[in-house]
């Protein structure tokens, strides 16, 4: 596997080092553990299980975003 060299502050290095669970862990292991690939919302929801309050909040946010996109704003009106 190819490697890359990055510069990080001493504080960032110490934080990463403190997250290693064993001497065998690499910094790549730590980074991948705490910053996994992007997941689909459906994967996250399946993992946390049923949560009606969260479902209602997501539905409301989705409706609000659609309404905001449909609004036609005339930016030249004040010119």
From Swiss-Prot:
Keywords noted in UniProt: Toxin-antitoxin system
Source domain of life: Archaea
Keyword ATP-binding tagged: no
Extent of the signal sequence: none
Pfam families: VAPB_antitox
Disulfide bonds: none
Cross-referenced InterPro entries: Put_antitoxin
Keyword Magnesium: no
Its job: Possibly the antitoxin component of a type II toxin-antitoxin (TA) system.
HAMAP family: UPF0330
Membership in a protein family: Belongs to the UPF0330 family.
UniProt name for this protein: Putative antitoxin MM_2475
Organism: Methanosarcina mazei (strain ATCC BAA-159 / DSM 3647 / Goe1 / Go1 / JCM 11833 / OCM 88)
Highest classification ranks of the organism: Archaea, Methanobacteriati, Methanobacteriota, Stenosarchaea group, Methanomicrobia
